[in-house]
Amino acid sequence: MSSGGLLLLLGLLTLWEELTPVSSKDRPDFCELPADTGPCRVGFPSFYYNPDEKKCLEFIYGGCQGNANNFITKEECESTCAA
């Protein structure tokens, strides 16, 4: 294969990798955790990734403890966990 062909192939593979959404193998493990309001009762609207529905959903976070599957915005949740 010529060097031009190899460069084209490399470019196409790089583009494909960049455009491929987050897959479950690349998703952080904490994205699989259930929503956890924690023991406090302040009541912050937050988002968590639901692996069964494959999307980010809103829940009420109590303000302390909980787990890492807890995002301030839906966009942050989607960019971290959504496929």
Curated annotation (Swiss-Prot):
Disulfide bonds join 31-81, 40-64, 56-77. Keywords: Disulfide bond, Protease inhibitor, Secreted, Serine protease inhibitor, Signal, Toxin. The keyword Protein biosynthesis does not apply. It is found in: Secreted. This is Kunitz-type serine protease inhibitor mulgin-3. GO terms for molecular function: serine-type endopeptidase inhibitor activity; toxin activity. The keyword Coiled coil does not apply. CDD domains: Kunitz_textilinin-like.
